[in-house]
A protein has these predicted regions:
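A short helix->loop->beta-strand "cap" motif at the edges of active sites that frequently abuts
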Residues: 160-164
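N-terminal cationic-hydrophobic initiation segments that often serve targeting/anchoring roles
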Residues: 120, 153-158
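Alpha/beta-hydrolase-fold catalytic nucleophile elbow
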Residues: 131, 168-169
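N-terminal, intrinsically disordered, polar/charged segments of Gram-positive cell-envelope systems
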Residues: 2-66
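Conserved SGNH/GDSL esterase-like catalytic core that processes O-acyl groups on lipids
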Residues: 57-148
């Protein structure tokens, strides 16, 4: 897709901050363009709490030193393709609102694996980027989807009380997908996410 996913910021419980980034910034790090002195380390914008974040200026890669990306197979691509080696990625194929708590997805230093939410609780971050829902939107009602997503976000907020939480929209699908998804439903659910 040529359009970046939009994001919604959740203010941290113990700090108000104008430091907000869009997923466009995250995806812009994938390009091989060199960093320059014109790039900032922290984007600035006037987005209100809970509103979509506008695209902001490009940031240096060190902006993501204290960031974590949480999600399913789409998010896994960040580590798979080594887009941002300095950010942590807690993601796995097929992760949904249930398996984020149970599926042993994250490899520990000792070789064992633990669920994403257990791994998230082990370290404090300044920025948490969340992209979930693609594995649910095909079958869940909007109300059920929002209740489950909201529960996961509440748990993330409790674990990361000082972090800014960015809820990224689900990406569109091609016409030939086999998962009961269509872009109209994805758009509907993305709009509904704005109310969380």
């Amino acid at each position: 897709p040529s359009q970046p996913a939009s994001s919604r910021a959740e203010e941290p419980a113990s700090q108000a901050s104008s430091e907000q980034a869009s997923s466009a910034e995250a995806s812009s790090q994938a390009s091989s363009a060199p960093e320059s002195a014109q790039e900032s380390s922290a984007p600035q914008n006037d987005a209100a709490y809970g509103e979509p974040l506008p695209e902001t200026e490009r940031v240096r890669s060190d902006y993501f030193d204290d960031a974590v990306f949480v999600g399913d197979s789409i998010t896994s691509g960040i580590s798979l393709y080594q887009i941002m080696d300095n950010a942590d990625v807690l993601a796995d194929t097929g992760v949904n609102f249930d398996t984020i708590y149970t599926k042993e997805s994250v490899r520990q230093e000792d070789g064992t694996r633990i669920p994403i939410m257990d791994a998230l609780a082990q370290k404090q971050y300044a920025k948490v980027y969340v992209m979930l829902g693609g594995n649910e939107v095909g079958g869940d009602s909007e109300e059920f989807f929002l209740a489950r997503y909201g529960s996961v976000l509440d748990d993330i907020k409790a674990m990361q009380p000082n972090a800014i939480i960015y809820v990224q929209s689900m990406l569109p699908v091609t016409r030939n997908n086999n998962y009961g998804l269509d872009n109209a439903k994805i758009d509907q659910f993305n709009q509904a996410l704005m109310g969380l």
